[in-house]
Regions:
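Outer-membrane beta-barrel proteins
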Residues: 16, 84-92, 126-128, 169-174, ...
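Detector for outer-membrane/organellar transmembrane beta-barrel domains
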Residues: 217-350, 354
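Membrane-embedded beta-strand positions of outer-membrane beta-barrel proteins
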Residues: 31, 99-101, 131-133, 177-179, ...
C-alpha cells in the first residue's frame, strides 16, 4: 500500500510543473528590497508614514505661542519593497499580448504594511497601435519624471498617480499619440466627505487625457498634453432643516509640457503644468464653493489653479550626483469664493512652494546606495475670497535627510 501512495505522490509532484506552464506564455519576475532612513527638522505633509515627503506643514502655535510643528521627526522603513511579474502571451489575431501585475506595501491607507496593487493590466500591441486595459501610471506622470531618491519621485511638482484606465496609443518611429480615460481607486479627489472615489463615481464621467510625444535617437523626448476632470461633490444638500436632492458638478482642465535630453553620461529633464484640481495626483490643488442656491442649498464650485514646474540634472552612472528643483505658485481661482473656510484639496493656503534636492548615489549591478538632502520652503497665508489667491504670507522651512539602500532582482 505504501509503495502505491509514494508512487501517486511522485506522479502528482511531477505533474505540477506541467500544470504551471502555459503554451506560448513567458513569465519574468522582478522587484527590489528597499530601505529608507529619513530625518526632518519639522512636521511635514508626508503620507505613507512619512516616506512620501511633499512639503513642510504650517506653524501650529500652542497656548503660549510655541510652534508645535517645529519639532523634528524621523524613522526607518522597508515596506516599499516591490514585487512584479511581466507576462507575454500568444497573439490575438495580429496583436501581441502582454500583462503586468505589480505590488508593494507602500499604500496611502492607515496601515501601510498591507499588500496593495500598484499595476495590473493587459495590453494588445499591434505594429503602430496599442490598447491598454487596467491599472498603470496616470498619463500625467508620463515618460519624463525626475531621477531622485525620495519615494515621492518629484511630487508635489511631478504628478504621481496610478489608476484604472483605458489607454490607446498610436506610435510611429518618432511620434506617440495618447488618449486615455481614467477612473479613480487608490489616488482620489477631495470633497465634502474627504478623499473619496465617490465624487467621480457619482459623476459618471472619467478623467480624460490626450497628449503627444516626440522621441529622437534615444536622446530627446518632448511632448505636451491636456487633462479634464469632472466631479460630482454632492448628491444631496441639507438646507434650512430640509434635505434636497441636488445635481452638482465641478469640471476643470489642466495642461502640461515636458522635455528630456539624455547625453552620454548625463541627463537634463523638465516639466511644467498649469494644474487645476490635481490633488489626487499628489500636486497642490483643489476647489472651493463659488455660490449657494438660496432655494435648496445647491452649490456651484470653482477650481484653484497652480503653476508648477521642475527641472532635474543627473551626471554619471556608477557614482551619480543629481540636482532637483521644484516650484509651485498658487494662481487663485477662476471665480470668487463664497467661503474660504470650506475648501477641498491639498495645500490651498500655500502661495508658493520651493524645494531644492541634492543627492548622490552609488550604483552597482543589483545594488544602489544613496544619500539625499532636501530644503523645502512653503509660503503660507490667508486665502482671499475675491480671487482665491494667498496673501499675508509667512514662510516655514524643512530640512530633510534621506539614506537609501536598494537591492534589485
Amino acid at each position: 500500500m505504501k509503495p502505491k501512495i509514494l508512487l501517486l505522490l511522485a506522479t502528482l509532484c511531477c505533474s505540477f510543473p506541467i500544470w504551471g506552464q502555459k503554451e506560448n506564455f513567458s513569465y519574468k519576475f522582478y522587484g527590489f528590497v528597499r530601505a529608507d532612513l529619513f530625518y526632518n527638522t519639522r512636521a511635514t505633509m508626508a503620507p505613507v508614514d512619512g516616506n512620501f515627503y511633499l512639503y513642510p506643514l504650517d506653524k501650529l502655535p500652542d497656548a503660549e505661542g510655541k510652534d508645535i510643528n517645529a519639532g523634528p521627526n524621523g524613522s526607518f522603513y522597508t515596506f516599499t519593497t516591490r514585487l512584479g511579474l511581466d507576462i507575454k502571451g500568444p497573439h490575438v489575431g495580429t496583436a501581441m499580448t502582454s500583462a503586468k501585475v505589480e505590488t508593494d506595501f507602500g499604500g496611502f491607507s492607515k496601515n501601510v504594511a498591507l499588500l496593495r496593487i500598484r499595476q495590473a493590466y493587459v495590453a494588445l500591441d499591434w505594429e503602430k497601435h496599442q490598447l491598454l486595459i487596467g491599472q498603470t501610471w496616470h498619463p500625467l506622470f508620463g515618460a519624463v519624471f525626475p531621477d531622485i531618491l525620495n519615494l515621492s519621485t518629484g511630487a508635489p511638482f511631478q504628478p504621481f498617480n496610478r489608476s484604472p484606465q483605458l489607454r490607446y496609443q498610436y506610435q510611429t518611429k518618432e511620434i506617440t499619440l495618447t488618449a486615455s480615460a481614467i477612473w479613480q481607486m487608490q489616488y482620489t479627489s477631495s470633497g465634502p466627505d474627504g478623499m473619496s472615489e465617490d465624487y467621480m463615481k457619482n459623476s459618471c464621467v472619467p478623467e480624460f487625457y490626450v497628449g503627444a510625444d516626440w522621441q529622437h535617437d534615444n536622446e530627446w523626448i518632448a511632448g505636451a498634453g491636456a487633462h479634464l476632470i469632472s466631479l460630482s461633490p454632492r448628491k444631496q444638500s441639507e438646507w434650512e432643516g430640509n434635505i434636497y436632492k441636488v445635481n452638482e458638478r465641478m469640471t476643470t482642465t489642466s495642461y502640461e509640457a515636458h522635455i528630456k535630453y539624455t547625453g552620454t553620461n548625463f541627463t537634463v529633464a523638465a516639466k511644467t503644468l498649469l494644474a487645476s484640481a490635481l490633488d489626487h495626483t499628489a500636486l497642490l490643488g483643489g476647489y472651493g464653493i463659488h455660490s449657494v442656491d438660496p432655494q435648496n442649498g445647491k452649490q456651484e464650485y470653482t477650481a484653484f489653479r497652480q503653476s508648477t514646474s521642475w527641472i532635474n540634472f543627473t551626471y554619471g552612472q556608477k557614482w551619480k550626483p543629481a540636482l532637483f528643483i521644484g516650484y509651485t505658485k498658487n494662481l487663485g481661482t477662476g471665480q470668487s469664493l463664497a467661503d474660504t473656510e470650506t475648501l477641498y484639496g491639498m495645500g490651498l493656503d500655500i502661495d508658493q512652494l520651493l524645494i531644492t534636492n541634492l543627492n548622490l548615489s552609488y550604483n552597482l549591478p543589483h545594488w544602489q546606495f544613496g544619500f539625499e538632502g532636501s530644503v523645502g520652503t512653503a509660503w503660507y497665508g490667508d486665502v482671499n475670497a475675491r480671487n482665491g489667491r494667498v496673501e499675508n504670507t509667512h514662510q516655514v522651512t524643512n530640512f530633510r535627510i534621506l539614506g537609501l539602500m536598494m537591492y534589485y532582482f
